[in-house]
A protein has these predicted regions:
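Positively charged
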Residues: 12, 18-173, 199, 203, ...
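Amphipathic alpha-helical segments within well-ordered protein domains
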Residues: 191, 202-205
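Small/polar glycine-rich anion-binding or flexible loop at a beta-alpha turn
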Residues: 180-183, 206-210
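N-terminal polybasic/positive-inside topogenic patches
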Residues: 6-8, 13
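Core structural elements
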Residues: 178-196
Length: 235
């Protein structure tokens, strides 16, 4: 593993982390350092602590701190070479909001998800870490005020099914803190916190808008509930 992480999302309380409304799409860097961390997908508006210890990613964080303090989190595929696996096309850029160096040479950071990106191409570089040219046009709603309109009238079933699913998977999560947050932020929190497979989370990450993500999440949850019902019936 290149870093360890402990997301603040699947804990006893889902804490608020609002979007950075002061940032505009054209202010996001077009060339970004890429952190292909296995078994982890970050969503816009979520927060994750990272423990950085591998030399290439120590260099990456230090370089980012000298510039825009932003890092692109992306899921590596199972294809490609070990040191340079193929990447999914869609990831999420995050901003370092906390930075601490430890006595043993590690760096502890807090990364706040800002906006999803699509990889255009990878840059040949002499740096230890990977860099990519990216675009954000498909995901402008991630940082627009329009994406933060409160509308929970159609989330009741999802919330109830998610509670059942969390309990079935052995998670103890308090979803009450989500009641006053916007729809997109809530769906992103649930997507990141859920015990869904990485492939399912990647599907949710790639949904262009809130309604599509809501429909996909309903479908995923319904499939799990259906499988559980069929298993009980067979027994």
């Amino acid at each position: 593993m290149d870093a360890t992480f402990k997301s603040t999302i699947p804990s006893c309380n889902l804490k608020k982390n609002y979007y950075n409304q002061s940032m505009k799409l054209n202010e996001l860097p077009k060339t970004i350092p890429i952190f292909p961390l296995s078994n982890f997908i970050m969503f816009p508006g979520t927060t994750v602590p990272l423990n950085i210890f591998e030399p290439r990613y120590l260099q990456m964080v230090n370089d980012a701190m000298k510039k825009h303090r932003m890092i692109g989190m992306i899921q590596p595929k199972k294809t490609g070479v070990l040191k340079k696996p193929d990447l999914y096309e869609i990831g999420c850029i995050g901003k370092i909001t906390s930075f601490n160096e430890t006595e043993d040479g590690r760096i502890l950071i807090i990364l706040n998800g800002i906006c999803r990106f699509k990889v255009n191409s990878e840059i040949n570089s002499e740096k230890l870490y990977r860099e990519c040219e990216v675009q954000y046009n498909y995901f402008s709603n991630d940082i627009s005020k329009k994406s933060n309109e409160v509308n929970f009238s159609d989330l009741n079933i999802i919330m109830e099914n998610m509670k059942k699913f969390f309990k079935k998977q052995g998670y103890i999560v308090n979803l009450k803190d989500l009641d006053k947050e916007d729809l997109s932020k809530t769906l992103n929190d649930l997507s990141m916190a859920s015990p869904f497979s990485l492939e399912e989370k990647q599907i949710l990450l790639e949904c262009l808008d809130v309604n599509i993500r809501k429909e996909k999440m309903e479908l995923i949850l319904n499939n799990y509930i259906k499988d559980e019902f069929e298993n009980k019936t067979l027994q």
